[in-house]
Structure formats: structure tokens, C-alpha cells
Regions:
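Conserved acidic segment of CheY-like receiver
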Residues: 1-12, 16, 20
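Conserved sequence signature across two-component system core domains
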Residues: 6-7, 32, 50
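Conserved active-site segment of CheY-like receiver
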Residues: 8, 80-84
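Short hydrophobic/Thr-rich beta-strand motif most characteristic of the beta2 strand and flanking loop
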Residues: 25-33, 41
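Active-site beta3 strand of CheY-like receiver
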Residues: 45-51
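Alpha4 helix (beta4-alpha4-beta5 surface) of REC/receiver domains from two-component response regulators
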Residues: 63, 67, 84-91
Length: 91
């Protein structure tokens, strides 16, 4: 399974990469730090799953998800957040 991780906190993305790569069936193909990079990386790698933070500087995870899904409706995107803001969950 090929995964891309996008998070503006390098500690979070590094920890996720370490945890996921402990499974031999998972390959972290790339990591990024904002929504614009997520869009580029998705097009380049066409991962099985895009694991992305919701809140990032510049283009956030929600906007990036909409853009990716507009071009790749079959995309599987998991959004992460450490915030408990219900407004983001509802979106």
C-alpha cells in the first residue's frame, strides 16, 4: 500500500512515517507540508491513501481535498487534526 503523508508539523509527519513503515505492506511514497504540495504529490505518486492534516498554512487540508477529489474522484483521503473544533469535523 502506497501512502503520502502531508502535515505542516515535521515531528508529526516523521512520527507517522515511522509508525506506518513498521508495517512491511506499507510504503510511505512521499511527505509534504501543505495543501499545495499535497496536490502535486498526489498527481505524481497516485497513492492508495493520502493522510493529511486539516489545518495547515496556505492551502489547508479541506481545500486540498476538494481540489484532489475534483480531479481524482476515486482518491482516498484521511484527514487528521489535533484540534477539537467541531466546525472542521462538520465540513
Amino acid at each position: 500500500m502506497k501512502i503520502i503523508i502531508v502535515d505542516d508539523d515535521c515531528l508529526v509527519s516523521g512520527a507517522l512515517k515511522t509508525i506506518l513503515e513498521a508495517n512491511p505492506d506499507i510504503q510511505v511514497a512521499a511527505t509534504g507540508s501543505d495543501g499545495k504540495e499535497a496536490c502535486s504529490l498526489y498527481k505524481e505518486y497516485l497513492p492508495d491513501i493520502l493522510l493529511m492534516d486539516i489545518r495547515m498554512k496556505g492551502m489547508d487540508g479541506l481545500e486540498a481535498s476538494r481540489k484532489i477529489l475534483g480531479e481524482f474522484p476515486e482518491a482516498k483521503i484521511l484527514l487528521l487534526t489535533t484540534f477539537s473544533d467541531d466546525e472542521y469535523i462538520i465540513k
